Amino acid sequence: KCDLREHQLAGVNWLVQSYRRGLNVILADEMGLGKTVQTITYLGYLKFVCGVHGPSLVVAPLSVLSSWVAEFARWCPAMRVVRLHTADNKERELLRTEMLSDVRTFDVVLTTYEMAASASMQSIICGRMSWRYLVLDEGHRIKNERTIQYERLRHVRCQRKLLLTGTPLQNNMHELWAP
């Protein structure tokens, strides 16, 4: 059994209320306070309590992708998670085929910024798939709208967006507009 801390529960409640209002949101706090856990709990709540099924796309730096997999297994093991990250072209094609054959076989796709922005994945991530949720971990990575990552992720078809960051926002409206 896993228990949320008080501030994490408040964060999940805020995410749920924001969803009900139809808002895209930024969850920004200091590193290590549990944004990943809050997000996983929130996606689980949407599926198992509200009946809102995915698929959801979580884009994160490679350095934390394994942590996302482990945290899903710990906090919401009933969620079907696919890790979409490989340098092997045959494996990429297999993943692409599996994902396109039946989206009901998974709830969440975890991938990296580099994989999401790669030309070989654009047909899935931005073309054929329609995502329930797009979660961008370390979302400050897309604040520069002149990057390829920003340009490609901008075209992801999704109903809602959640940006996670441990990097403080500056007093700059442009930074809030870019994501």
Where are these regions (language model features)?
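ASCE P-loop NTPase motor core, strongest for the SF2 helicase catalytic module
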Residues: 1-179
